[in-house]
Amino acid sequence: MDHADLACIDLDLPSREGFRKFISSWLYRGDGFTVLVDPGPLSTVPWLCRELRRLGVERLDHILLTHIHIDHAGGTGALLREFPGAAVICHPEGIRHLVAPEKLWEGSRKVLGALAEAYGEIVPVPAERIGFAETIGPAGIRAFLTPGHAQHHCCYLLGDLLFAGEVAGVRCDVPGGIFMRPATPPRFVLEVALDSLDRMIALAPRRMVFAHYGVVETPLQHLRIARNQLLLWVRGVAETAAIEPARREEALVAWLLERDEQYRNECRLPQDIRARERYFLGNTLRGMMEYVDALSDGERQALGEMRPA
């Protein structure tokens, strides 16, 4: 495929500190076929529509959702009003939550608080406009169920380009390297996340789009870093399990900063983006802690002995 047919549309939130170069929507235009990946939250739909019009987009054939979290899919229903010919592709587990999003919105408000309000309420998607397909459109886009970040997560392969969503976590460019961290909110299961990563590695993509953030030319390197990070971070959670709850997160962060080169690059992030990442870190660690703390003593000990490749 011709990667010149790709365009990134940044969906910044000026009202929130550090919410720049974080949320993005990706546009692909082939021969008579137009696809948008992750339209973002409701509050950025007006900007997204202006950018699509500026780029000369008159119709969307498909809207592909990597998952249904509010910052990726919350604006889908509103976007359909502007592009009534589009069909939405979503993980089968996520469809009902977008058709009737009341519980999804309630959960988003509970977890994110004021940030959910900044994203905007989730607009329902008509049931006849949303579904799942393993192969999409004349470009032959392939959809893969990749639970881990969420049970309703999908990745999409367009030629040799992988739209990875958050299967490999979050990344940012920093001077002289990259910052990366896992994205493992509660209901995280290590084995499930590793299986999804292994299947994406087996596809051997040549380019990869992170939902957060950017396109990379070394996807296998990034996928392997993400896999090693999961193993390392879960080991850290296991090794700090005996520390009192009030001190555990602080101790775990110190443990990680000593051992994880990519996470240690947090210090190279701009101050506002660093604050944003610290905000989301708590949810990542909670997901891992809930997973590890539910294991038996023997299982936790085995995790403590695991080493990344």
Region annotations inferred by a language model:
Residues 239-309:
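C-terminal regulatory/interaction regions
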Residues 89-101:
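A short, structured active-site edge motif that brings together acidic residues
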Residues 98-145, 151-220:
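Metallo-beta-lactamase
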